[in-house]
Amino acid sequence: MDPNCSCPTSGSCSCAGSCTCKACRCPSCKKSCCSCCPVGCAKCAQGCVCKGASDKCSCCA
């Protein structure tokens, strides 16, 4: 189990939009959780499960 995620690091799980984990990489969706997903950020939209919008977006710089 990922200590920052409610789902196991292996096996299937659901990565919902309300994900609160920091480093969840679920094999079933192959996406990581991201706290920065401003409007128009295509990179985050494709590779992250958004935890919440933020103006300070480091993963999309």
UniProtKB/Swiss-Prot annotation:
Protein residues bound to a divalent metal cation 5: 34, 36-37, 50
Binding site residues for a divalent metal cation 7: 50, 57, 59-60
Entry GO terms, CC: cytoplasm; nucleus
Binding site residues for a divalent metal cation 4: 33-34, 44, 48
Record region (Beta): 1-29
Sequence positions that bind a divalent metal cation 3: 15, 19, 24, 29
InterPro entries, sorted: Metalthion_dom_sf (IPR017854), Metalthion_dom_sf_vert (IPR023587), Metalthion_vert (IPR000006), Metalthion_vert_metal_BS (IPR018064)
UniProt binding sites for a divalent metal cation 6: 37, 41, 44, 60
Coiled coil: none
GO molecular-function terms, A-Z: zinc ion binding
Annotated positions binding a divalent metal cation 2: 7, 13, 15, 26
Keyword terms, alphabetized: Metal-binding, Metal-thiolate cluster
PROSITE patterns: METALLOTHIONEIN_VRT
Amino-acid positions noted as binding a divalent metal cation 1 in the UniProt annotation, renumbered to this chain: 5, 7, 21, 24
GO biological process: cellular response to cadmium ion; cellular response to copper ion; cellular response to zinc ion; detoxification of copper ion; intracellular zinc ion homeostasis; negative regulation of growth
Region named Alpha: 30-61
Family membership: Belongs to the metallothionein superfamily. Type 1 family.
Domain observations: Class I metallothioneins contain 2 metal-binding domains: four divalent ions are chelated within cluster A of the alpha domain and are coordinated via cysteinyl thiolate bridges to 11 cysteine ligands. Cluster B, the corresponding region within the beta domain, can ligate three divalent ions to 9 cysteines.
Function comment: Metallothioneins have a high content of cysteine residues that bind various heavy metals; these proteins are transcriptionally regulated by both heavy metals and glucocorticoids.
Protein name per Swiss-Prot or TrEMBL: Metallothionein-1B
Species per Swiss-Prot/TrEMBL record: Ovis aries
